[in-house]
Amino acid sequence: MKLRNLAVVFCAASALLAACGTDDDTGANSNAGAGSGGRNSAGTGGGRAGGANTAGKGGSAGVDTTAGAAGEAGNPGTAGDGGSGGEGGAGPISATFTVTLENVAPTKSLTSTGVFNTPVGDLAAGPAAPGKTYKFTVDAGRKQKLFFATMLAATNDLFFAPNGDGIPLYLENGTPITADVTSQVYLWDAGTELNEEPFVGANTVTNQGTVNTGTVDTNTKVRKIGTVTEGFVFAYPAVAAMIKVTVSHTTGTLFEVTIDDLSTAALTTGDLVSHPLPLSPGVWAVSSAANALFTDQLPAPAHGLEALAEDGKPATLSTYLATNAGITYPASPGAWLLHKTGSKPLFTSGAKDLGKGLEAIAEDGNPAPLGASLASLDGYLTGGIFNQPVGSATAGPIPPGSMYQFTFDASPGDSLSFASMLAATNDVFFGPKDLGIPLFDADNLALTGDISSQVYLWDAGTEGNEEPSIGPNTVTNQLAANTGTAGEGKVQLLSAVTTDTYSYPSAQSVLKVTIAVK
């Protein structure tokens, strides 16, 4: 009996000492130390067991964790150690994500190009003599211009071409033209060979023994013949007395271009002999950019203009132009949002557009309406717009070589959705599937790296598709925003649009999407 009383006294003293100790120390009897757990890590186990018939206190939870289980009771009559408390559960996981949208598409300086080399009625390629005609057809949008070049044969390096602005194929109100455009054509000196008297000089194209011969011009700039004072100065007839150029709209966005070598085209040399003036085969190009073939008052580009202007040979220039022809696809400003996994905030594949602003991005590259609607979208957690390219002081689309970035915090159960227009189209946009991209896997590991394979080209179904970069209602050619014919009526993968026979790039060939996590 005395021994039992001593044991009780001893236990009471021990309890008092434990109460004065630190929170995480082990305590005797019922005052077991509490287990602690940091954020994102398990709490430690409980303290030592309590006294007889008393369960040890469970380990307390770490920050945002689950408390450990209580310790087991000691044996009756014995101040044995109680069971240890269980470990606290893991705290919630969070990470900071930076998303980069980079335009990796090639840049094309021309929309299309070609060669004209066979006069109408002839069976073989060759120059056009007076009375003969070259014809070719171009496909062009409202913002695109016509360029061409053909040599004035019997000279050293003279050629006919429009100036650097090209020839507009539409009026300002969008009406396609049918007109005589000769007044927009000039006679140019390529600046690559010193001028001699036409038809007489030893290195003029009709007299030279081989191609690319003659004296180097002392002025190497491309310039209009009326300003040339170097070499043999000759009074050439007016352009309209030598050739006639007409453009005729045929249908849709197609135009037929006719270059007539006038039957009266001739010049008289110093020996008072009148010579007919043939035209050489040439090249044509359609572009929305200026100076598609050359730049006035700059040296001729080293990609074939010299061979055309000196020898009437378009092959080298044609090959160069062909490698630079195609469509340049910018990506537009857009909107992004973080949302609960399982929600479909921006659209549902196969269903009509929600009317929350996706149409404005898909048709016009305008993220403002969708940005203003984000908080009302299904599963919305946070979001915003991206409209300023990295390194730029102003908002705008990203051409090839540029990128957008945006940053946010996310936790398991969160997904990412975004939309950005494939510019040069009617209503095509980049985006993940309608459920978005989950940002954590089943083990709560954050998604990182290149996620381009999870991004697709979608058709918003709000506007009928036309030929990219050419159609009158594509974003680069439309006269006003939100114009065009009715669309398919549902959001769907672009590849699923059966009424569209035009060619498009893959999403990954234009937009590279990566995620960095910290």
Predicted regions and their residues:
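Structured domain cores in non-transmembrane regions
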Residues: 93-178, 251-254, 263-434
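Mature, soluble, non-transmembrane domains
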Residues: 130-250, 391, 397-518
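Glycine-centered secondary-structure boundary/capping sites
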Residues: 27, 312-315, 365, 484, ...
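Sec-dependent bacterial lipoprotein signal peptides
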Residues: 1-18
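Ser/Thr-rich, Pro/Gly/Ala-heavy low-complexity intrinsically disordered linkers and tails
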Residues: 15-92
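Compositionally biased regions
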Residues: 15, 31, 37, 42, ...
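Detector for intrinsically disordered, low-structure N-terminal pre-sequences
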Residues: 7-8, 41, 62, 496, ...
